[in-house]
Amino acid sequence: MEMNFVPDATFYMRVRDESIGGDNPFRWDYKTSKEIFLHKRVVVFSLPGAFTPTCSTFQVPGFEKAYDEIRSLGIDEVYVISVNDAFVMRKWMIDQGVEHIKALPDGNGAFTEGMGMLVDKSNLGFGKRSWRYAMVVQDCLVEKMFVEDGKMDNCPGDPYGDTSPEMVLQYLKNVA
């Protein structure tokens, strides 16, 4: 996947819009992968699901903590992708106390499938989800890919290590 372009996909997000008023001042916003990644160098990490143990205990807090250091190494933004809808992703980011990393809800799994990372996790009652990966994207081109070992449908485990913020930081420091 390295040196290939990210797939064309649309992310469906809810954004606060004070002009709406009322108890739910949010509107739909649609961003394409091109709008998100063009003319930028970003870190993206993807995980099986919001509110899941490894994702909530290690991966999201780790990237949030490492945000400033990652940015200092020539990265414009840090994104988390999950095959969850915008409502779930927003609530999860609030629950996690995230202030810096940005959520990209891939509710239809289109981006994840285009990355070749969509797996079946029906053995856990999850349905189709993302395999855990991280990547550095430069101007829509995948510069570096980190993928957990053992990618397969209905994987009995949840490997984590190769896609940690520490691994991404190590790479960024080596190429800086």
Q: What is each stretch, according to the model?
A:
Residues 1-176:
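Chalcogenol-based redox active-site neighborhoods
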